[in-house]
């Protein structure tokens, strides 16, 4: 995946891939999956969102399948968790939440940037940035037979959407693409963390 903004956003995409690979593998450990299951979750959590985005914008085969570095980094995240599983199991849940929020922010920004690169309407770019951020976690939860976090009363997709929107707004206000991406990513990251720590939830229907 190549960006007009240069190597920085490419590095952001790879960083998100590593973080979500680690997060997916950690979920596999918690779900008592074997090595194959761990690697499948690392791969799907890290790359599914980007694959969905690329299919929707017509970038086929998806970047994650064209460029070996994506798969390599996703599997590296899985390997880190596998070989350091005793250490990983001792990591507080708060650290996992921070890593997940960081991965969400990185992917929301990278997904929005690629959508803009493909001349998508800003509203569509926001949706594609959100899909990039939440797609992997959705597949992870489905594979673990759980209700996807994006469908729960939780500020998750909302945080990704807010970050993507802030990124586009920043560019409209004259910020450089890099600075706008930083602003959007920080908003997504901060909103996700605050929502978890303050127990913010979206409204639900009770009956």
Which role does the model predict for each range below?
Residues 136-146:
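Membrane-helix boundary/interface segments in integral membrane proteins
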Residues 1-122, 145-207:
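Alpha-helical transmembrane segments and their membrane-interface boundaries
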Residues 122-125, 138:
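Membrane-embedded alpha-helical hairpins and interfacial helices in multi-pass inner-membrane proteins
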């Amino acid at each position: 995946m190549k960006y007009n903004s240069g190597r920085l956003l490419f590095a952001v995409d790879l960083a998100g891939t590593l973080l979500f690979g680690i997060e997916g593998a950690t979920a596999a450990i918690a779900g008592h999956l074997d090595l194959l299951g761990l690697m499948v979750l690392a791969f799907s959590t890290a790359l599914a969102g980007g694959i969905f985005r690329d299919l929707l914008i017509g970038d086929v085969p998806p970047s994650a399948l064209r460029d070996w570095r994506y798969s390599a980094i996703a599997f590296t995240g899985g390997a880190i968790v596998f070989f350091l599983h005793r250490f990983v199991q001792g990591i507080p849940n708060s650290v996992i939440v921070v890593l997940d929020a960081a991965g969400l922010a990185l992917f929301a920004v990278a997904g929005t940037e690629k959508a803009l690169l493909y001349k998508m309407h800003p509203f569509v770019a926001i949706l594609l940035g959100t899909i990039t951020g939440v797609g992997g976690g959705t597949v992870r939860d489905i594979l673990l037979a759980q209700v996807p976090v994006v469908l729960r009363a939780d500020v998750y997709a909302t945080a990704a959407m807010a970050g993507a929107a802030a990124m586009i707004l920043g560019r409209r206000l004259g910020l450089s693409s890099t600075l706008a991406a930083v602003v959007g990513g920080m908003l997504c990251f901060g909103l996700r963390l605050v929502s978890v720590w303050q127990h913010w939830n979206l409204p639900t229907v009770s009956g």
